[in-house]
């Protein structure tokens, strides 16, 4: 889950296990090449309700018409059907949905904002937090994250590298 200040009010987080960013799934024919284009008056942007993409869009796209929906698939179909210019969501999801609809969409993966994913934990449970952090550190050190990426996310890793972007498990 994305670790952010709003969520920190009610839960604690482990150390990050991944870094990602918000990206754009644009309709193939929409006049959108970057975030600057989304800031133009009259742009239609869909977001998933309750996500960091929604909060980012509401803060950064004051001239856009923002539509919040409950499901990823509903957001994708708004783009595919040409009802909106773009969807703001995480890079990995944007890549996956674009690959399912290449004839109707484009993925703009340069991050609008970088985010960290971490394990959410009950506030104050330092023992569990320490255990989770130790496990994550061990997985980084022994190559577990790299093996998981090879097995389950090779396409996404390669696509990000082709665009000169760091892969989500490549933490500094």
Where are these regions (language model features)?
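Ligand-binding clefts/hinges and TM-proximal coupling segments of bilobed small-molecule sensing domains
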Residues: 52-67, 136-172
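Acidic, polar ligand-binding/catalytic clefts
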Residues: 1-39, 105-106, 110-112
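Short beta-strand->loop
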Residues: 12-18, 65-67, 99, 103-113, ...
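Short amphipathic alpha-helical coupling segments at ligand-binding clamshell hinges
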Residues: 90, 124-138, 144-148
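A ligand-binding cleft/hinge motif common to bilobed small-molecule-binding domains
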Residues: 1-10, 55-56, 80-113
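A bilobed periplasmic-binding-protein/Venus flytrap-type ligand-binding module shared by bacterial periplasmic
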Residues: 23-32, 116-135
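Hydrophobic residues within well-ordered alpha-helices
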Residues: 38, 78-80, 119, 132
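Bilobed "Venus flytrap"/periplasmic-binding protein-like clamshell domains
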Residues: 19-77, 91-95
């Amino acid at each position: 889950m994305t670790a952010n200040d709003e969520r920190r009010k009610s839960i604690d987080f482990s150390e990050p296990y991944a870094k990602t960013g918000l990206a754009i799934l644009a309709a193939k024919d929409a006049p959108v090449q970057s975030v600057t284009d989304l800031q133009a008056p009259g742009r239609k942007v869909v977001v998933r309700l309750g996500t960091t993409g929604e909060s980012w869009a509401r803060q950064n796209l004051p001239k856009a018409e923002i539509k919040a929906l409950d499901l990823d698939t509903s957001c994708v179909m708004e783009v595919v059907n040409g009802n909106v210019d773009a969807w703001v969501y995480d890079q990995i999801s944007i890549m996956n949905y674009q690959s399912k609809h290449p004839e109707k969409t484009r993925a703009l993966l340069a991050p609008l904002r970088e985010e960290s994913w971490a394990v959410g934990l009950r506030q104050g449970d330092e023992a569990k937090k320490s255990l989770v952090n130790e496990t994550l550190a061990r997985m980084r050190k022994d190559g577990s994250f790299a093996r998981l990426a090879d097995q389950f996310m090779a396409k996404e890793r390669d696509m990000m590298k082709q665009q000169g972007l760091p892969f989500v498990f490549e933490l500094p």
